[in-house]
């Protein structure tokens, strides 16, 4: 008996537009203190190139790492300004200035700037309910749920955090992490009165998996957040390596090797 001719099943044809629409699109990082979108050419990742032979470590979409890499920088050569609007006395410690306001009070210093950036990321990611920090006495300061859609209220809350929290309280609420496991968003911190804290703003790795990292800081008195130079670098690179021995030497503070912390 003759078999019927085989006929291929016709499948629906999807247009390119339909395919594109079916792929989820991750929103670009946002920076609520800005009125305008960030120019891609002015971001930290665009302006501070990875050293030769290194590539930026992977970062998930929407992560703190992605957000930090997208931070807007002021034009090349910009000075670090104090909260008073005056130039900081030392202009030899930075390679770039982050385009984020410092306020008009002597509050947004070292740990304050670290907490500000962490909180801004949470707020901009729709996670304002997670914005909370311990004060020096150990009390948990939480952003009011009733004000979570109000950026002005968020900024007012952060001023309160700056007044009652600092390096001593922040160090206690962060988790100890070994330098070999360093990641974007980690913090080198020494709690005290005074103490100091710097934020790991980026991490790159080479083919052998060896990392290098960038650091951000504010300092005393309150001043603009800036990308630190590496005073030990022989070629002027701002990238730090893990071969720093018992102390991590930064331009204005030295940290012990056990000073690295991570957000819980």
Where would I find each of the regions flagged by the language model?
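Extracellular-facing segments of soluble proteins and assemblies that are Gly/Ser/Thr-biased and enriched
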Residues: 99-180
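Catalytic Cys-His active-site segments of thiol-dependent hydrolases/isopeptidases
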Residues: 190, 201-228
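Cationic-aromatic interfacial patches
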Residues: 29-99, 108
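Bacterial N-terminal signal peptides that target proteins for export
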Residues: 2-15
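Low-complexity, Gly/Ser/Thr/Pro-rich intrinsically disordered linker/tail segments
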Residues: 218-264
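Short coil-to-beta-strand transition motifs
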Residues: 189-197
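Structural motif
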Residues: 183-187
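Bacterial N-terminal signal peptides
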Residues: 12-24
């Amino acid at each position: 008996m003759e078999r019927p001719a085989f006929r291929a099943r016709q499948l629906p044809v999807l247009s390119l537009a339909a395919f594109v629409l079916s792929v989820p699109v991750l929103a670009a990082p946002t920076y609520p203190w800005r009125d305008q979108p960030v120019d891609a050419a002015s971001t930290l990742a665009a302006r501070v190139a990875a050293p030769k032979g290194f590539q930026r470590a992977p970062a998930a979409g929407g992560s703190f790492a992605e957000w930090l890499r997208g931070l807007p920088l002021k034009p090349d050569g910009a000075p670090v300004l104090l909260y008073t609007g005056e130039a900081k006395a030392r202009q030899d410690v930075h390679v770039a200035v982050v385009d984020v306001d410092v306020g008009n009070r002597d509050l947004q210093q070292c740990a304050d700037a670290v907490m500000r950036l962490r909180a801004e990321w949470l707020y901009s990611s729709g996670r304002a309910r997670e914005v909370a920090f311990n004060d020096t006495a150990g009390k948990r300061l939480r952003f009011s749920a009733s004000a979570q859609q109000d950026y002005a209220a968020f900024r007012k809350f952060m001023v309160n955090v700056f007044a009652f929290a600092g390096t001593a309280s922040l160090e206690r609420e962060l988790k100890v992490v070994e330098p070999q496991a360093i990641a974007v968003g980690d913090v080198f911190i020494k709690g005290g009165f005074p103490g100091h804290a710097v934020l790991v703003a980026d991490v790159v790795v080479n083919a052998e998996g060896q990392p290098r990292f960038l650091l951000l800081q504010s300092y005393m008195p309150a001043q603009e957040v800036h990308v630190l130079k590496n005073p030990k670098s022989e070629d002027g690179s701002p990238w730090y390596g893990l071969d720093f021995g018992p102390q991590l030497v930064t331009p204005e503070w030295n940290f012990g090797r056990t000073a690295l912390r991570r957000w819980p």
